[in-house]
Amino acid sequence: MRAQGIRPAMLIVDTVFSSDGVWPDPAGFLADAAAAIRAEGGLFLADEVQPGFGRLGTSMWGFQRHGVVPDMVSLGKPMGNGYPVAGLVIRPEVIAAFGAQSRYFNTFGGNAVAAAVALAVLDVIRDEGLMENAARTGAVFRDSLAGLA
């Protein structure tokens, strides 16, 4: 890209490549990619729509497996457990720069019902031990598949 005079703006990555059949990549490999995009002046967005909210069983967010803190995190599907809600979490310095350079308005932002649903989902994840259940269930599934190999 540099040879063509193209400056990258952002690296957007599903932190576990969950659309590829949830094939576990080596933990930590995204750290170098995040460092590379930042060295070029770009931002790193961790797409947590699929792996987020404890679905991996080891941490609340897939990016935690890589030892990185993203500039932005996209959230979705499990956030509302079927209710339409999504979110974008942005580092304070990134949103401050955006706000200084752009005017922004969102027609559907700040929906109180959607926010209440998302908070209730967080309570259920914590109170019912869903992350721990994902770890147990995932281990049984992996072990069962290994037995077929």
Show where each model-derived region lies.
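Conserved N-terminal phosphate-binding loop of PLP-dependent enzymes in the Aspartate aminotransferase
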Residues: 1-149
